Each structure stands twice: as structure tokens, then as C-alpha cells.
Regions:
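Short, flexible loop motifs at catalytic/binding sites
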Residues: 1-223
Length: 223
């Protein structure tokens, strides 16, 4: 009898933990990443990402110096958490090279296949034919598509577009690089966003002409 009660208590505790991880991004992060050391900036980023998840925030720009966990949060853990919460979601992940974007896709895909993820989101898995790291689907109709800045997004629509460091160090040294990224953004992600969708831009600042600078000026003119 006591053993049965203990099992029920443990099961209830696990269900409560799962619910907390499903609803609170930092709880999910700590569950997936036990060695994670939380800082004040993590709390601020997590609060904003949760607002995106709830549909309260449609545009989010995160500017930080390198080595502050911004990519791990925005391009690895966040899309996985969002897929768990909304497994029919269409996510477009972009960064300055296709190779790097595909690498993020591989990490998210691998995370979804772990026991830790399946414990929190037991109904979510990859579609059986999802082999490629840069283009895969969930069992619930969700889609993940990795792309380099400048690449064609024809035929791709996204509920969530994540742009992580759109400028490489090389392109940041040229004015053309900034203009090319802006042209791609206005002709690609912004046009391909589904109604009600969100865009998250994460980057290290390079110049007032970079994508963050262009967006801030654009929003000031047309909020």
C-alpha cells in the first residue's frame, strides 16, 4: 500500500514538473540542461520569449555580445520548446550561412528525439520520413526549415521566423552586406510570415546599418 502511494506521489510530482516545463521556458531549459547557470539576462530573455509564445509579442530583437547564451536560447532551446507546445507550427530558422542554420536544425531535431524532451512533451515526435537536419516535420504537421540569409524562401510560410546573427564578420565589413540582408528580409521572411506570426531577431551589433538598425528606423517611420 505504501509503495503504491509513493508511486502515485512520484507520478503526480512528474506531471506537475512536466506542466511547469511546458508553460515556463526557464523551467524547460533547466530540465534539458542541468548544468545551466542562470543569470539576470537569461530571465529577461526568457520572459520576452514566453510573451512571443503566448502571442503577446510579434516582433522581438535581442542584441547581445557573443558568449551570452543568446543563440542557445533563441535558436536551439526556444524552437524545440515551441514545437513541443505547438507541434503543428511552421518554423523558419535563418542565420548568415545555410550551414550554421542547418546545424541549429540538427540540434533541435536531436533534442526532440531525446527521452528528456519526450517526458515533457510525450505526444510530439518527428515524422517518420524526417531525415534531413535542415528540413524536417513533426508527427502533428509542424515544419522546420533552415536557411541562410540571402537564400530563397519561395513556397515557405512560417508561424515563427528566427534570425540569428544575419551578418558574418566578413559581410559586416561591407555596406553591401547590410543592404543585402535588408533586401532579403523585406522580400523574404517578412513576406512569408503567416498571419499572426512572430519574428525574433538575435544578433551582435555591428553597425547602425545592420539589420537591427534598419528595423528600428523602419519601425520608427511606420510603427
Amino acid at each position: 500500500q505504501d509503495e503504491r502511494i509513493l508511486k502515485l506521489e512520484l507520478r503526480l510530482a512528474q506531471l506537475e514538473k512536466n506542466e511547469e516545463c511546458q508553460n515556463t521556458f526557464l523551467s524547460f531549459v533547466k530540465n534539458i540542461w542541468p548544468s545551466f547557470i542562470q543569470g539576470r539576462h537569461h530571465e529577461i530573455i526568457a520572459e520576452k520569449l514566453e510573451r512571443v509564445a503566448r502571442g503577446e509579442l510579434k516582433r522581438l530583437i535581442i542584441n547581445m555580445a557573443p558568449r551570452h547564451t543568446k543563440s542557445e536560447f533563441a535558436s536551439f532551446l526556444f524552437p524545440a520548446w515551441m514545437m513541443g507546445r505547438s507541434p503543428n507550427m511552421k518554423i523558419i530558422q535563418a542565420t548568415h550561412t545555410t550551414e550554421l542554420a542547418v546545424n541549429f536544425g540538427r540540434k533541435v531535431k536531436n533534442l526532440i528525439e531525446t527521452d528528456e524532451f519526450k517526458t515533457v512533451f510525450p505526444d510530439v515526435s518527428l515524422a517518420v520520413d524526417s531525415k534531413a537536419s535542415g528540413r524536417w516535420d513533426t508527427n502533428k504537421g509542424g515544419m522546420y526549415y533552415a536557411v541562410g540569409v540571402g537564400s530563397n524562401l519561395a513556397g515557405r510560410g512560417g508561424d515563427l521566423v528566427i534570425i540569428d546573427d544575419p551578418h558574418s564578420e566578413q559581410t559586416a565589413m561591407s555596406n553591401n552586406g547590410f543592404e543585402d540582408a535588408w533586401d532579403w528580409y523585406t522580400g523574404g521572411p517578412r513576406q512569408r510570415l503567416q498571419p499572426g506570426g512572430s519574428i525574433v531577431l538575435v544578433q551582435t551589433r555591428w553597425s547602425e546599418k545592420d539589420l537591427t538598425g534598419q528595423l528600428v528606423r523602419s519601425m520608427a517611420k511606420d510603427p
